[in-house]
Amino acid sequence: MYRTHNCGELRKKDVEKEVILSGWVDRIRDLGGIKFIILRDRYGKTQLVVNPNSPAYEISQELGREWVIQVYGKVLERPDETKTEMVTGEIEVEVNKIKVLSKSDVPPFYPGENVSEDLRLKYRYIDLRDERMQKNLIIRHKMAQAAREFLNKHDFLEVETPYLTKSTPEGARDFLVPSRLQKGKFYALPQSPQLFKQILMVSGFDRYYQFARCFRDEDLRADRQPEFTQIDIEMSFVKMDEILDLMESFARFVFGKVGIKLPEKFDRLSYEEAMELYGSDKPDRRYGMQLQDFTNYFVNTEFKVIKNVLERSGSVKGFITTIPISRKIASQFEEFVKQYGLGGLLWFKLDDEIVSPTAKFLKESYKKIVKEYNLDKGSVVLLAAHENREILNTALGALRLKVGKEYFNELEKVFDALWIVDFPFLEWNEEESRFEARHHPFTMPKNLEQKLEDIKAYAYDMILNGMEIGGGSIRIHDSEVQKRVFEIIGLTEEEANEKFGFFISALKYGVPPHGGIAFGFDRMVSIAANVASIRDVIAFPKTSSGICQLTGAPSTVEEKQLKELSIQIFKGGIENERNES
């Protein structure tokens, strides 16, 4: 037996027990010849005491940090003045025997030290000993267990779908896997199980879920990885409202299992409302500061900057806040919004009178805003003008978020969840001069008889604290509608059959109305763990350039392997060398 208890288990009730503990040496102190050792495992830490007269004293002199040891001893109550806030802080173990299970070289850093992320990822086995990282993975486990518990209780079946499948690009690049047996042909790793889960609905499995590994060869950010985990869910014979209601309950249950209370009812905003009020389709509403349309207060202005915009049917929008403002801060904000296409930023604050660098030109307009919105002393209004409403909303939305994060960080612990619905069905691709599906081409449109740019989709995103944690839609279950959608996005019948023939065929054999959602599990855990990057909730993540620092992947392979796959490496890329024989 290596241990009778773990390092986070012993309490005052265990005093006088003979115990065996195993773990890592976290700290060693020598006080007056007495050795104090903190022993650590994933459950916690326990203080060990080795007296000079102990049979274990000699070996305790040799120990180093991060060595793995086994100790035998008796549980004692600590003197009151030495008790700590540790969960085991009321006791210590007086050691009479130490066995070294494994020595450790001096590590490049110790668990919990502040070092670069590259170093943490290279020596991930050291980094994962940090109690913060272990806490994150424990949260991940609890949320995964909760998700399965909820879905199993609601009659969902967990079904696995293939990793090696057909390349059907969904926006990002596919990761391709060459076939050895089918020379010159490639599998693709799935960007999502989208078509397989819809085929499961056609097959009669009316409630499906899967913890799906998904792969996308795209540029990475703090919340992106080339491989990531989705909780993939699909249902048959359901309306959109039924999906949204059940998935709200799902989210409340999963987050509730890790101590996070979500709202009893999630608000629903249309895409257009979200953009108008928050300048984002992923609004973080915790900060308030909704965007306001101030255009009417400036219709008679002679101030050239605004007058020119209004003559081109533009708008004036902004938001009201209470932050301290100065010319220096306003100048920083102005440079920020210029990155989003605005020419500048206007502002005023209400002290005993209106204070603004543009007050002599716009004071009457500012007075109207003060009166209409009943502004109090200390109020600050940030506003801008532009002829393109989308640019205006997006820029002010980004500024609103910047102000919220910098000045109202006490709201970070609040949780706000909502649905965004009524997304545009299509978006215009400038480079290819055509419409393409905003979500994917299997989303059900609301009305195909409208102008293409006005068509809305039965699509929905779940937003938590300004992050999209889930997205889905009602799917097309009519082969004629699916054919029409392919035509609208510029796919010929031949191209559609080449890419999706197997799926188009399935639509001919009795398809139930169905819809679903996919939750970004890594992102959900990162919110619950309150970390900035999903790399901190994944055991072995890639860097922002897609490299595994631990293993060195991706790496070169032997020439023999390439020949078996009929692949030749050449400067600038990979060439498929077809073997005619």
Curated annotation (Swiss-Prot):
Tell me the segments the record calls region Aspartate: 194-197
As recorded in UniProt, its EC number(s) are 6.1.1.12
Which keywords accompany this UniProt record? Answer: Aminoacyl-tRNA synthetase, ATP-binding, Cytoplasm, Ligase, Nucleotide-binding, Protein biosynthesis
Q: Please give the PROSITE patterns that the UniProt record associates with this protein.
A: AA_TRNA_LIGASE_II
An annotated GO cellular component of this protein is: cytoplasm
Molecular function GO terms recorded: aspartate-tRNA ligase activity; ATP binding; nucleic acid binding
Q: What is this protein called?
A: Aspartate--tRNA ligase
Q: Which organism is it from?
A: Thermosipho melanesiensis (strain DSM 12029 / CIP 104789 / BI429)
